[in-house]
Amino acid sequence: MSMNSIKPGAYQPLCPLQALVLTLGVCESSVKRWGDSGKLPAAKTAGGHRKVALPSIAGFLRETGHPVAQPELLGMVASGVARPLDEARDQLFEALVNGRESESRELVLGFYQQGESVPRLGDMLIGPVFRKIGVEWAAGRVQVYQERRSCEVMMAVLHELRRWLPEPEPRAPLGLVGTPLRDFAEVPVRLVELTLLAQGWRVTPVGSGLPLEEILDTTRANSPLLLCLSATHLEHPEDFLRKYQALLIDPLRESHPTVQHALGGGAVERAC
C-alpha cells in the first residue's frame, strides 16, 4: 500500500483503516488495492499504523462517486441523488433561517462529496441564498436573529468543510484574506479562504473590519503573492474605492510590486 510519513502536528485528520472499511462498506483488500493504485493513499503514523487522511478520502469519493455505507463514522454525509446546485437554494434558505444546522450540513457537504468545487458552492448555492436572506431581511420577512443564526450555521458548515481540504505544501503561494473597516461579514471571506486552500494555496486571514492602513502594514509584513479583500457592507462604496486605490494599492505597488490584489463582494458589485 502506498505509504507516506505523517509529520507530527500537521493539520491532517487521519482515519484508521478499519473505520474506513466500515464507512465505505467494503473489504480491507479493496482499500489496500486502491492504496496500491494510488487512488486512496495511506500514511504511516509514528507507531507504524496505516491510516488515511480525510482529504484523501474526500478526493477519492469526489473522483469515483463511491457510495458511503456508514457516513456517521467519519462525520460524512449519506450519498444522495445528484441535482443542480440551484435546485437546492430554497431548501438551504429554509434550513438556514430556521437554524437547521444538520440539514444545511447535509446539503453543502453532500454536494462537495459528490464532486462540486468550493467556488461553485459559493457562486451557485451559498452566495445566492445569502443574498436572498439579505433581501428578505430588508423586507421584514426575515428577523435579525434569523440572519445572524444563518451566518453561524454556515460558518459551522464551512469549518467542517475545511477538514476535508488537503493541507497546502510549505512552499505553496501565500494569500491574505480579510474585510475592510466596519465589514464583519464572515461567510464571504471564509469562502475566499477555502477557495484558495482548495487550489493548494497557503492562506492567512488578516482579520475582519480592518482599516486600509492596517491591511497595508500586514501585507507588507507577510509579502504574499495575493491579497484578497471581501467587501459585503460599505457605508460609502465610491469613497471606499477611491481610498482603496490611494491608501492601499498605490503604496503597495511602490513597496511590493509583485503582490497581486483582488477586491470583491456584494458591496463592490453594487458600486460598479
Task: Give residue spans per PLM region.
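Polyanion-binding surface elements
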Residues: S2-S30
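Short helix-loop-beta junction
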Residues: R190-T204
